[in-house]
């Protein structure tokens, strides 16, 4: 084997080793820097159900025995973000309250972003923990619910908007139809810093 060829082979082997090492380092850094998204759980009667943490859960509107399943999980507060089909909302309210579950409706359009008063109400519920286990839902569990969970992640857990949007997409957020929601999430850190209605939630973090 010529000296030049041996040198070339050595350089290739060295470059490969460096590339593999860098790739492993990048994966390790991603594992450290990327927070865990909500754990998806199979709950009868509720699609796209996710456990955000020990006191906060998300999903689509409960169907069938869905509310009873929430009771079994220890959920004592339901936050309903639907603003449409008032009859369905009232039916769910009656079912929840008959089981001793607190029911709160923060009505909004499936095409609109959240307003400050709704976010403040939701954040106030979070502050009440550990006395409460909260389930938040909209119609399908991806858009409005994802937006509120993103707000929680940013305000209480220090996530970046990009990380929060990534979690939204993992729960079927329809960006094509609702790009305004992702834009709202991206602007949220600055909005939290300047909104008078959200002043008491600045630099807040959930306790472990």
Q: Where are the model-predicted features located?
A:
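Bacterial N-terminal signal peptides that target proteins for export
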Residues: 1-10
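Cys-dependent protein tyrosine phosphatase-like superfamily
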Residues: 14-134, 147-208
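Short cysteine clusters
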Residues: 138
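Glycine/aspartate-rich loop-and-adjacent alpha/beta segment that forms the canonical ThDP
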Residues: 144
